[in-house]
């Protein structure tokens, strides 16, 4: 992996191989989302951003036939389809930073990379405490979580209509890809 990291640092891409090649089968079979798709979601977390993107997508849909269902969905449709559903992503942790909040609570900021790019996410509270040992640089991990309305984890949360709500990815489970591989073999 050091050789691949040097290669990427020098020319900006992995040329001879990708660090995930050893786990390609597992990543493709177990995962239902990618870094690219999660970054697109991040651009749609606010209602204003979703409305602007929807208008642009609608213009493009009117001008051409969409063959890929993912491209045909507006941001609100994508969120409606995925909110509350399990999302699974596999990759290699390329950056890991353990931090402390102003109140003294530990949390972490991470970047995972797959075949489509990189995605930055955070872990807080019990999720951080439970999984921080796995979320280390160069670890091959399998993430599970859901798309939910921002604040949904709080006791007195009142949901808003999809058109008005802000959304976030809520990390719920982390495991090593090799352990997820065992789950795949048991199917």
Please place each PLM-identified region on the residue numbering.
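Noncatalytic, beta-rich nucleic-acid-contacting surfaces in large DNA/RNA-processing enzymes
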Residues: 1-187
């Amino acid at each position: 992996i050091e050789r691949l990291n040097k290669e990427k640092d020098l020319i900006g891409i992995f040329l001879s191989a990708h660090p995930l090649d050893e786990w390609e089968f597992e990543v493709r079979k177990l995962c239902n989302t990618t870094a690219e798709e999660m970054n697109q979601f991040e651009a749609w977390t606010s209602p204003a951003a979703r409305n602007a993107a929807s208008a642009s997508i609608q213009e493009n849909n009117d001008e051409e036939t969409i063959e890929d269902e993912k491209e045909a969905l507006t941001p609100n449709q994508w969120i409606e389809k995925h909110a509350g559903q399990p999302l699974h992503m596999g990759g290699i942790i390329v950056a890991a930073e353990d931090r402390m909040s102003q109140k003294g609570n530990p949390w972490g900021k991470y970047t995972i990379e797959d075949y489509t790019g990189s995605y930055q996410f955070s872990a807080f509270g019990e999720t951080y405490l439970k999984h921080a040992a796995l979320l280390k640089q160069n670890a091959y991990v399998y993430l599970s979580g859901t798309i939910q309305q921002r604040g949904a984890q709080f006791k007195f949360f009142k949901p808003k209509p999809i058109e008005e709500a802000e959304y976030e990815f809520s990390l719920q489970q982390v495991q090593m890809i090799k352990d997820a591989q065992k789950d795949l073999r048991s199917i």
